[in-house]
């Protein structure tokens, strides 16, 4: 377990990593590299939203971006002229859900659904949760990527995002 102070520090450091990536992303909504202390400290511009999260630790509700993913066969992609460098090959997938009523859940320190999905993903990559070229641990709040890093067995120095995350990169 962690003390609240330790958990806040880990969240600030993780979100600082996300902001560093977003600062270099030309498509990011908030291109600024924040250090962990700036993310953790409540200020007029970084007010407390819901304990323990300040504004710089939650989804940015002022962003209105969209994206699309088209899934097709390799032959069809070639016919459409999609360059190989823009293709992503899916080797599998997984889905699960938690009870929508969080009061029904048996605990709050981990997610059974997340563990099931990430366990399936780890199996798909041969049992090594660190075997990814790139990963995006996207979430409204730091707690979900923190749990995912633990489930995947990531060290703190593993890059958890390629976009900059929901706070800094943005989303619909």
Give the location of each predicted region.
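Conserved "HGTGT" condensation-loop signature of ketosynthase/thiolase-family condensing enzymes
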Residues: 1-76, 83-171
């Amino acid at each position: 377990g962690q003390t609240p102070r330790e958990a806040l520090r880990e969240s600030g450091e993780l979100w600082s990593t996300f902001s560093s990536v977003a600062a270099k992303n030309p498509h990011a909504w908030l291109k600024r590299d924040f250090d962990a202390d700036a993310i953790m400290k409540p200020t007029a511009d970084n007010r407390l939203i819901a304990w323990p999260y300040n504004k710089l630790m939650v989804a940015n509700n002022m962003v209105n971006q969209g994206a699309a993913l088209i899934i097709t066969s390799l032959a069809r992609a070639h016919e459409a002229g999609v360059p190989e460098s823009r293709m992503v090959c899916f080797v599998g997938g997984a889905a699960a859900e938690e009870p929508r009523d969080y009061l029904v859940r048996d605990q709050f320190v981990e997610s059974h659904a997340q563990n099931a999905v990430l366990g399936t993903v780890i199996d798909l990559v041969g049992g090594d949760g660190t075997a990814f070229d790139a990963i995006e641990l996207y979430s409204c709040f730091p707690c979900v990527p923190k749990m995912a890093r633990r489930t995947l067995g990531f060290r703190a120095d593993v890059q958890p995002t390629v976009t900059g995350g929901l706070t800094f990169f943005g989303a619909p």
